[in-house]
Amino acid sequence: IFLHLEGAKSGVYVYINGQEVGYSEDSKNPAEFLINKYLKPGKNSLVVKIFRWSTGSYLECQDFWRISGIERDVFLFSQPKTHIKDFNVVSTLDDTYKNGIFKLNVDVANHTTAGKDVNVSYELLDAAKKVVAEGNAPCNVTADGQQNISFEAALNNVKTWTSEQPNLYKLLISLKDGGKTTEIIPYNVGFRRFEIKPTDQLAENGKPYVCLFINGQPIKLKGVNIHEHNPETGHYVPEELMRKDFTLMKQHNINSVRLCHYPQDRKFYE
């Protein structure tokens, strides 16, 4: 069982049933605490103690409203004792900008006192829910340890992601223990390729212009800065306001956003 704090500023102590669980001071990144050993049957007490200033405040002292407290969602979640801890996806294009290159790395964690033999698999589905890539591999995870599993696939004539046509594929990562599926994680995947390279056009100094390319096409950035701020709730920004901001950006032909000066809430990227 994990306690997940999406964001709190600036120094955070967590206590369960009067026992200190841990400390975090990275205000704009999530903090997770494994809390099993602090819990008891029945009702439990959870206390989060927040300090306005911490040793991390020097790095976080940027030009914005300095508001302290819980700034994002806080929730509990549970996973099997042997579970998918993390994963990383690379989804880009080859030099033709037509074919997809897919790479998946999965970290499996084992919180038991004995080694575990599990199976990790994935499926990549297109918009019609057709499987376009799949794979599976056995995974031996040592007691109280972690193991990485990697997959690669090449996809011909993928539906690429662009701002105008944001085609997405659905990735399903599964974990089986003893032949039984214990975990399935869904994730959206888009195939696109970013490059910064010189063009054939020369500037007045005789040197070629250097441009940003997405899927082989030069892109002119029309961007804005955005802060995580709400006139009614301070630094807590609900999903409805995020969507409203994106709608306004689209209406004004904005195609890029600079996040000032920190990672945004996970929902912002999704």
Please give the residue ranges for each predicted region.
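Conserved aromatic beta-strand anchor motif in extracellular beta-sandwich/beta-rich domains
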Residues: 14-18, 120-126, 175
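Short glycine/proline/serine/threonine-rich loop/turn segments at secondary-structure transition edges
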Residues: 39-43, 115, 155-170
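Short strand-edge motifs at loop-to-beta-strand transitions and within beta-strands
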Residues: 29-33, 145-153
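N-terminal carbohydrate-binding accessory modules
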Residues: 172-251, 269
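Beta-strand-rich binding/interaction modules
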Residues: 99-140, 147-151
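Surface beta-strand/loop "capping" patches
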Residues: 81-113, 203-211
